[in-house]
């Protein structure tokens, strides 16, 4: 069943001779529970694509459907609710609040949405993240890999249908990178959440169900990984 559909997506910065076409007529769809890796060189349009899918940046033209809704027909208030409740964003930089402990950083999206954390859900999430004994630690008391686990927890606390990860292992060593990808894959499988991950690492991309290659704002390949 389809969760995401991107139709004729274009994004242009500037105008005239100085215009930069970050995305040029991009179209594809992703099924519920699918794990898709998006690869391409720096400046190819990968991050722009992810931000538009997540409702963070607006397209110049084209449409993005998530679970049947064209998200760019929503007003600002409804689009903000969509971002909070339907999308989990994970970045290369952890963006944790330094004065909040692990538990507080993870549950922050719920509080911003005027909802109370469910203790059983939080305990299960902390356990899966391997952070149960770190729940009261501040970010500066954690390793880079542990901080990225917190950012993953923060992205997952709302049980989003769509997880978007932009180079989530970019600041980590090889072991921590492998652990993070395994963790994302585990959540993808356990909760049947759709995962779109940007990476420069070919070995990481091969762990996905499918690889989409982008260059100069266009899809150059779209292939299913056969195992």
Regions found by a protein language model. Give the residues of each.
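ABC family nucleotide-binding domain
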Residues: 2-214
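H-loop (His-switch) and adjacent beta-strand-loop-beta switch element
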Residues: 211-223
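ABC ATPase nucleotide-binding domains
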Residues: 226-227
């Amino acid at each position: 069943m389809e969760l995401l559909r991107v139709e004729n997506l274009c994004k242009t910065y500037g105008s005239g001779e100085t215009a930069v076409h970050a995305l040029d007529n991009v179209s594809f769809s992703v099924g519920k529970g699918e794990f898709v890796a998006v690869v391409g060189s720096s400046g190819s349009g990968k991050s722009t694509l992810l931000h538009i899918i997540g409702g963070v940046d607006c397209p110049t033209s084209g449409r993005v459907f998530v679970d049947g809704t064209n998200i760019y027909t929503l007003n600002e208030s409804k689009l903000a609710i969509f971002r909070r409740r339907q999308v989990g964003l994970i970045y290369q930089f952890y963006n944790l609040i330094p004065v909040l402990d692990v538990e507080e950083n993870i549950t922050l999206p719920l509080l911003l949405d005027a909802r109370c954390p469910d203790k059983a859900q939080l305990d299960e999430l902390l356990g899966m993240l391997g952070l149960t004994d770190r729940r009261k630690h501040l970010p500066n008391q954690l390793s880079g890999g542990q901080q990225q686990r917190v950012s993953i927890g923060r992205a997952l606390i709302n049980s989003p249908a769509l997880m978007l990860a932009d180079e989530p292992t970019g600041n980590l060593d090889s072991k921590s990178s492998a652990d993070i990808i395994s963790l994302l894959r585990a959540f993808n499988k356990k909760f049947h959440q759709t995962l779109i991950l940007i990476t420069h690492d070919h070995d990481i991309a091969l762990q996905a169900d499918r690889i989409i290659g982008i260059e100069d704002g266009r899809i150059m390949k779209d292939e299913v990984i056969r195992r």
